[in-house]
A protein has these predicted regions:
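Beta-strand-rich solenoid/repeat architectures in extracellular/passenger domains
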Residues: 41-47, 59-75, 89-98, 113-124, ...
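Glycine-rich beta-solenoid repeat tracts in large extracellular/virion proteins
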Residues: 50-60, 75-83, 99-106, 125-132, ...
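Outer-membrane translocation/initiation segment of Type V secreted surface proteins
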Residues: 2-4, 13, 46, 52, ...
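Transmembrane beta-barrel strands of outer-membrane/channel proteins
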Residues: 750-756, 795-803, 844-852, 897-903, ...
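Extracellular beta-solenoid/beta-roll
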Residues: 230, 235, 239, 268-352, ...
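Outer membrane beta-barrel transmembrane domains
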Residues: 787, 824-827, 912, 916-1019
Length: 1019
């Protein structure tokens, strides 16, 4: 603490100087006053001056309140230097035209104080310029510099800067250090035209509990700085909150009260880390500047944190660690390593509004919670001993190998285990609990027990809206016990019939539970959903049957809907009457323990073990009187085989009650009139095989099912034409927008083109044909021209609009249909050209565009509207050279190659008749390989240039659509040939016009013809 001794001073021409007597008294008298043997060498300044001051001779200096020391020239107003000074305090004002305060002390420990209300300022340089300081700098006042508020050179060491709650440090850069120091900020550090704090070298530690604010970055590290930040205050930057750009390891520790305004960027170092303690929320991104950049690790050691921004984690091993507390992530988290959740800790993905993504592995020994804001596919493999919960109402699709051994609780929404995915370990006793409002379905491998609570649903895969019927192994299979207190839903959402749900374990139903199925009510072998229980059944459940197109028929043994491998103790009852026309069906349990739908008032006898009156075994439950074995459960006395319980005219009695008129095999309760095989409840009138419920009147094979329709709806062609037109509407090459024959280095190009295209094609296996006419207007302009060491780079923007009209006809159908697409797009392009003047040498052209479309399909059946949107990007290369010739004109040859990626997302559409139109894939890749030959005048390159181009077009794009799961292709050939003829010339000194005609040809009667007009204006 400074001793406040009054000293006399006198003015010289340049400095305040203390006389020798005053100096001696100032050094000795305070010690005498406090009765100690110590001697304090101190100087107190109590008068203002415009003369720069040098603090070097005494141990302590104090500038009193209301005292101003200023300097009008480049010399610092106050300089603290030498090896004697131990303490200097400013309670007044230090103002310099150059630096305000210069500090250059020795190896001794020095304390510099800027008191409450005190000011240190500079109008042209640094307010505080520290060349060398070992010790502490405490600021409770204002430090305001034109350049830096405070600047610390490399010569400083073991320096700690404390900015108290009353302190403010401000400059273009608030505080800049080239040495490793400590910064404790309880006040404000402000960068008015740059960073608030920047560290270039050394190990710097920043503890911020108040405000750090920059117009560029809040805090940044550069060069070889090692920057450690502990933040419980606010760090903000108009560009980024924090920029870690040094090559050394930087750390960020966020504590309770932390607020970041702007992102945290990591680059150049692979070892930067983020740690969370206490509680808090952040919406900033913690990401890398370039691909491969990011944070080596993110560690949660706090109580509760929510991060809603994106995070790039580039470490290996356990690089995302949740050691304690609850961590919520609601952005895209890219993790090249593994995520580990410790016991008693939790990781939540999504915050109920935003959806999080997480890549890498996941070891869960605590709890993982899904609370996503939208439908979400989770591909990360989950291991460990922890539990998983889903609390949102959206759809979660698991596609990974999930071998965690804990329990799973589903509070809401839909959870899907997709084909190839795994949930649980074989032999595990873990349980998936499906609560009220939640649905669970699997097409993969589920090795857990399932507990369906009241209001919950265990569903077949295709019972979930949007899922298609799958035939892969493991679909609709549970390898564990099922306890059903809610609904076991087997009926497909699309009203199809034939699901087979398998429980490789026991089934227990409780009061109020239901099993819901679809059936086509008919004879014994009619299609139906089916439940297979390989274990035993207990309890009770209601069975709800929905008839799908069944006309009803008399059953013999019944339609089996539930089979049980073990003890069959469950009581199943119909939840509602089951009626098909005049036929009513009951649910009976046979002696084999299985359950059957039967159109009978009483159940059938045991169908597998009946008595034959002739002392023979009869497998069909019939009496046979001739002592012979009949495979359908009947005895045929005339030596004929009769498989269906029928009377055979060879003189044998068969109790199946059917007539068979002559040496024929008849498999079940049918009339067969002549030497034909009839396999199921059909009338067959002459020499034909009929396998499934159809009437066949002559010479044809009818297998009970339909192939692709012989007569196709013309709307199919309209949908196909619309999709193909939208996919290709705005795809273009460089020559479509730039045909300038001569160009100066600084010329920019404004352009516009109009193109028309007529395209016709057979599709759907030649069952539908359509033609499409497309017109496109595209406008754009360069906004940048940058000469390079080799060539020139130009870039620009573009926008456009287009319309496509399709007319579709179908064979054997008098109707037709029309399609229409109105499209719009915006995009950017860039071109590097080796020789811009004559467009010689190599070039690279790229563009990217976003497009959106309004689509219509009209016919005499329906008018349909639907939307789509897409993105496309292109890379094109070429190289042009001139064939040397002595003639006035010669040829310029230009081989070209182009690859285009197209993404078109068409909303799934269901028309008014229930026809569902869906796309199978959204991604397409197109290729072009060709050569262009231009015939130009050597002495006047601006003269008109005719040209010809030949191209090989590769890729048909995504040209398949599914209509009610029936895939139809537009049959666009994968390989097509293209011929272009055109001419380019100047309308005036700055305007060029290009005219082109083109044709394309390929398989499947594919043909396309087009015209193109381009105007280029250079300026």
């Amino acid at each position: 603490m400074f001793l406040l001794t009054q000293m006399d001073v006198y003015m010289s021409k340049k400095f305040f100087k203390l006389n020798n007597t005053t100096k001696t008294l100032g050094k000795i008298f305070p010690a005498l006053l406090i009765c100690t043997p110590a001697v304090a060498f101190s100087a107190i300044i109590d008068q203002s001056t415009s003369v720069p001051q040098d603090f070097s001779a005494d141990a302590e200096y104090v500038i009193n309140q209301d005292v101003t020391i200023s300097s009008a020239d480049s010399e610092a107003a106050v300089s603290v230097s030498g090896f004697k000074v131990n303490n200097a305090t400013n309670n007044g004002n230090i103002s310099g035209t150059g630096n305000g305060l210069n500090i250059n002390t020795g190896v001794q420990s020095v304390v510099i104080n800027n008191g409450i209300g005190a000011t240190i300022s500079s109008t042209t340089a640094n307010a505080v310029n520290i060349k060398s300081l070992r010790g502490d700098f405490n600021n409770s006042g204002s430090i305001i510099g034109a350049e830096n508020g405070m600047f610390v050179s490399k010569g400083s060491s073991a320096l700690n800067i404390t900015n108290t709650s009353n302190g403010m440090i401000k400059g273009k850069t608030g505080l800049s250090t080239q040495a490793g120091i400590g910064i404790n900020n309880y006040g404000s550090i402000i960068g008015t035209n740059g960073d608030a704090i920047t560290a270039d070298y050394g190990n710097t530690k920043v503890i911020n509990s108040c405000t750090v604010q920059g117009t560029d970055n809040g805090i940044s590290s550069k060069d070889t700085a090692n920057l450690d930040i502990l933040n419980s205050g606010t760090i903000s930057g108009e560009t980024n909150a924090i920029m870690f750009a040094s090559s050394e390891i930087n750390t960020l520790l966020l504590d309770t009260g932390s607020t970041l305004i702007g992102d945290v960027i990591s680059t150049n170092s692979k070892g930067n880390t983020l740690t969370l303690i206490g509680t808090g929320t952040e919406d900033s991104n913690f990401i890398g500047l370039n691909e491969g950049d990011g944070f080596a690790s993110v560690t949660m050691n706090g109580e509760s944190w929510a991060l809603s921004g994106n995070i790039d984690i580039i470490g290996s091993g356990d690089s995302l660690l949740v050691e304690t507390g609850a961590l919520t992530l609601a952005g895209d988290v890219s993790n090249t390593g593994n995520t580990r959740v410790a016991k008693d800790a939790s990781l939540q993905l999504g915050d109920g509004e935003k959806t999080a993504t997480l890549s890498g592995g996941l070891t869960n020994n605590g709890t993982v919670i899904f609370n996503q804001g939208s439908d979400f596919t989770f591909a990360t493999d989950m291991t460990g001993s922890g539990n998983v919960e889903k609390v949102d109402s959206n759809t979660l699709t698991l596609t990974g190998k999930n071998s965690y051994t804990g329990d799973t609780v589903l509070h809401g929404g839909t959870t899907l285990v997709s084909t190839g995915a795994t949930l649980g370990v074989k032999g595990s006793n873990a349980t998936v609990t499906v609560k009220n409002g939640a649905t669970f379905a699997t097409a993969g491998e589920v090795n857990n027990n399932i507990a369906v609570l009241s209001g919950g649903t265990l569903a077949a895969w295709n019972a979930v809206q949007g899922n298609s019927t799958l035939s892969a192994s493991g679909v609709d299979t549970i390898n564990g016990n099922v306890t059903n207190g809610g609904t076991l839903l087997l009926s497909a959402a699309d009203n199809s019939v034939g699901n087979n749900f398998t429980i490789n374990g026991d089934y227990t139903g409780s009061d109020g539970s239901q099993i819901v199925m679809n059936s086509t009510l008919g004879e014994d072998n009619s299609p139906t959903d089916h439940l297979t229980i390989t274990g035993s059944s207990f309890g009770q459940s209601g069975v709800s049957i929905t008839n799908i197109g069944g006309a009803g028929a008399q059953t013999i043994n019944g339609m089996e809907i539930v089979s049980i491998g073990g003890s069959s103790e469950a009581q199943l009852t119909l939840a509602k009457p089951v009626v098909a026309g005049a036929w009513e069906y009951n649910l009976y349990q046979h002696s084999d323990g299985n359950w059957y739908l039967e159109s009978k008032a009483t159940p059938s006898d045991d169908p597998s073990d009946d008595t034959d009156d002739g002392g023979n075994t009869d497998d069909g439950g019939n009496t046979d009187n001739g002592g012979n074995t009949d495979d359908g459960g009947n005895t045929d006395d005339g030596g004929n085989t009769d498989n269906g319980g029928n009377t055979d005219d060879g003189g044998n009695t068969d109790n199946g009650g059917n007539t068979d008129n002559g040496g024929n095999t008849d498999n079940g309760g049918n009339t067969d009139n002549g030497g034909n095989t009839d396999n199921g409840g059909n009338t067959d009138n002459g020499g034909n095989t009929d396998n499934g419920g159809n009437t066949d009147n002559g010479g044809n094979t009818d297998n009970g099912g339909n192939n692709a329709p012989e007569v196709m709806a013309p709307e199919v062609g309209a949908y196909l034409g619309n999709y193909l037109a939208a996919q290709g509407m705005f795809l273009h090459k460089r020559d479509d927008r730039d045909q300038i024959t001569f160009r100066n280095e600084d010329d920019l190009n404004t352009w516009m083109y109009v193109k028309g295209r007529y395209h016709e094609n057979d599709a759907g296996g030649d069952k539908v044909s359509y033609d499409t006419t497309t017109t496109v207007l595209q406008v754009g302009s360069d906004f940048m021209s940058k000469p390079m060491d080799n060539g020139i780079l130009r870039a620009g923007g573009m926008f456009g609009a287009g319309q496509a009209k399709t007319h579709s006809d179908a064979k054997h159908n008098v109707r037709d249909a029309q399609g229409k697409v109105d499209g719009f797009n915006v995009g950017l392009y860039a071109t590097w050209q080796e020789d811009q003047k004559l467009r010689l040498g190599s070039y690279v052209d790229t563009w990217a565009a976003y497009s959106w479309y309004n689509n219509k399909v009209t016919s005499n059946r329906n008018d349909e509207d639907y939307d789509s949107e897409g993105f496309a990007a292109s890379v094109e290369v070429g190289h042009a050279w001139v064939i040397q010739s002595e003639n006035e004109r010669t040829w310029k040859i230009e081989p070209q190659a182009q690859v285009i990626y197209s993404y078109l997302d068409q909303e799934n559409h269901t028309d008014r008749d229930g026809v569902r139109v869906t796309t199978l894939d959204n991604d397409s890749v197109f290729g072009r390989l060709g050569v262009k030959a231009s015939y130009f005048q050597q002495k006047d390159v601006k003269a008109w240039q005719p040209y010809v181009a030949v191209n090989w077009l590769k890729g048909a794009g995504q040209n398949d659509l599914a209509l009610n799961d029936e895939t139809v292709s537009n049959d666009t050939p994968e390989d097509r040939g293209q011929l272009e003829l055109g001419v380019t010339g100047n309308l005036n000194e700055t305007t060029t016009i290009s005219l082109r005609a083109s044709g394309e040809w390929g398989e499947n009667s594919y043909a396309a013809y087009g015209g193109h007009i381009l105007l280029n204006h250079r300026w």
